[in-house]
Amino acid sequence: MKFSELWLREWVNPAIDSDALANQITMAGLEVDGVEPVAGSFNGVVVGEVVECAQHPNADKLRVTKVNVGGERLLDIVCGAPNCRQGLKVAVATIGAILPGDFKIKAAKLRGEPSEGMLCSFSELGISDDHSGIIELPADAPLGTDIREYLKLDDNTIEISVTPNRADCLGIIGVARDVAVLNKAPLQEPEMAPVTATISDTLPITVEAADACPRYLGRVVKGINVNAPTPLWMKEKLRRCGIRSIDAVVDVTNYVLLELGQPMHAFDKDRIDGGIVVRMAKEGETVVLLDGSEATLNADTLVIADHHKALGIAGIFGGEHSGVNGETQNVLLECAYFNPLSITGRARRHGLHTDASHRYERGVDPALQYKAIERATRLLLDICGGDAGPIIDVSNEATLPKRATITLRRSKLDRLIGHHIADEQVSDILRRLGCEVTEGQDEWKAVAPTWRFDMEIEEDLVEEVARVYGYNNIPDEPIQAGLIMGTHREADLSLKRVKTMLNDKGYQEVITYSFVDPKVQQLIHPGAEALLLPNPISVEMSAMRLSLWSGLLATVVYNQNRQQNRVRIFETGLRFVPDTQANLGIRQDLMLAGVICGNRYDEHWNLAKETVDFYDLKGDLEAVLDLTGKLGDIQFKAEMNPALHPGQSAAIYLKDERIGFIGVVHPELERKLDLNGRTLVFELEWNKLADRIVPQAREISRFPANRRDIAVVVAENVPAADILSECKKVGVNQVVGVNLFDVYRGKGVAEGYKSLAISLILQDTNRTLEEEEIAATVAKCVEALKERFQASLRD
């Protein structure tokens, strides 16, 4: 936002220079991007009047003038400006004047005619780039007055970056409030007395979308002269804010926008059919905007309409059909409060970004509309004449924003600032900010002002107190760096160690958004309830993820579309599961997930092209699980997951608790997500694995180990892991190793059965095992398998 320093000082005038003012504004949180003078460096330029203006005898495009600058005689000046004419008040650079660029004015002859000065344009004085003609001053400009003094050119343009939370500073009044608070100076608001209605004319106004438009004010002003010139003082203020003067009506609404931060619009009343209706657009409805472009609207766009058609996009852009033109005599002034959510994103959808939409998207003061429409009415009547009717007010108090009541605790204030500010100072700061303050025992209750809708929680008040008190006034404290023993335990398994192992196995870490497409998430987790964002970045990022698979699979598709068919990626991050028992109704679980697809190895002349399968991913996952020391307690059990292939997937259990899933992506899901070929995924709840089992040293047996192999026939649906687990349990004191080394199906084994060849390693730490003991242990294992799984020894 750009504004004139002198305009700001009309509202509040602290006894500090421009540099100090700019620094103060920056320290207050409104970063100053630049301070530039409004005009170039010049002197010797005064107000003059063209008394005579005749054609140059030797040049078609030059005029010979006699100019009165308040001296003893008239000056002869040759001028080539097309708008030079008799009776015009102008800016005259007299002999001896120095203009920007160190250009000195001297007496000269132009095509044989003497010239004792120069009639100046805005560009020649370094005021603007306008060189279309000489400056035209008001008829009452006093002759001989220094032009710098008359136009108040000893001024600066200050440009600031306004953060989204400080929308109240998108008007002079907001910046002035902050400067007044920081300097304990009075805020001198211009007189904005109500304008008495002199006519009774009104217009029917209906608000059908009260949630989107809680307040809409209108006022009829009749008999205006739309061609009346905008006063030079207003043009200059607008120019110094970067706004070009258009016509008196538009200039007035722009002036109020810059002064109060309240967007306004003026309709040609005679072009409104029936009355004003504030409603949501009809799907596909069109409106021709003031710039001549046609916008096709969606049903979620708020429009200002009459009884037959849309007149403009509410809070963004007016329509051409109802706009003010050179023949307008009667206008309807509009001043409204629109809910920011009803405006946000609509302008960008149509490739627009206007001063109005910029403010409405961030929010305007919901109590400002009366002041703004009275201010605009008075300015319009003073410039264009006419008669004003009464204000038409259509408000819905139930949908207007309510002022926040916030409790500020002394303990919280001192802890966050790190410095004690006296109670009296805290109360004074809050009141100067516009809050209604009630002091309590070590606390304050503050009702935020209507223009500070960013004040919502206790931390906001702490920030405001520190900002106004002055960060530079908070004393530096030496850092307390006492020696603190680390909390790391040997049993802690860091994610960094896990990530390093996955990196060593060829995986690359990715970070995806926690916001995902709800449609894609429903494909992966059908029927699952997700947390939906009330104000998402986009529709495709409007749900919080229930797992990391949504982002990982989207990343795989992205890479496959760029000819990267061999992908190995992993991610660690939070998933967000709605849970009424959790804090704030949402459970956040730290997850570890990975995806692989494509060939097992990079292309190589000595390696066959083999596509990855379930056991490739399972092997990598078991290597990770082995870091926890809990691999022996891990089981892979057949369990349905709608996102995974029913025959090539498993649930992962730690003892009796499920901690994740692994498997091939379901073919139907693979098709819907446009995945190219077999894709395998896994996901683990990491918090259930983060504590590793620390290896315990034990005595190495000095006695020989004995191996015995058995082959048992079991039903096809019996997991081999259960067989191995049972063998370990039965021979707990002597069986030190169990391994599955062969699986056989075929001749000699009945249909629906399989043969598992298992090696048993038996050993004792205190003695050599006798053959009878070994045989008894093996027989015990076989008997246990027979009893539990109906296993039989294979012949």
UniProtKB/Swiss-Prot annotation:
Its cofactor is Mg(2+). It catalyses: tRNA(Phe) + L-phenylalanine + ATP = L-phenylalanyl-tRNA(Phe) + AMP + diphosphate + H(+). GO terms for biological process: phenylalanyl-tRNA aminoacylation. Its main location: cytoplasm. Residues 39-148 form the tRNA-binding domain. Gene3D superfamilies: 3.30.56.10, Bira Bifunctional Protein, Domain 2, Ferrodoxin-fold anticodon-binding domain, Nucleic acid-binding proteins, Phenylalanyl-trna Synthetase, Chain B, domain 3. Its EC number is 6.1.1.20. Signal peptide: none annotated. It comes from the Bacteria. Mg(2+) binds at D454, D460, E463, E464. SUPFAM superfamilies: Anticodon-binding domain of PheRS, Class II aaRS and biotin synthetases, Nucleic acid-binding proteins, PheT/TilS domain, Putative DNA-binding domain. Residues 701-794 form the FDX-ACB domain. GO terms for cellular component: phenylalanine-tRNA ligase complex. The keyword Amino-acid biosynthesis does not apply. CDD domains: PheRS_beta_core, tRNA_bind_bactPheRS. It is found in: Cytoplasm. Keywords: Aminoacyl-tRNA synthetase, ATP-binding, Cytoplasm, Ligase, Magnesium, Metal-binding, Nucleotide-binding, Protein biosynthesis, RNA-binding, tRNA-binding. One of its GO terms (molecular function) is ATP binding. Binds 2 magnesium ions per tetramer. Tetramer of two alpha and two beta subunits. NCBIfam families: pheT_bact (TIGR00472), YtpR (NF045760). Belongs to the phenylalanyl-tRNA synthetase beta subunit family. Type 1 subfamily. HAMAP family: Phe_tRNA_synth_beta1. This is Phenylalanine--tRNA ligase beta subunit. It comes from Salmonella typhimurium (strain LT2 / SGSC1412 / ATCC 700720). The gene is pheT.
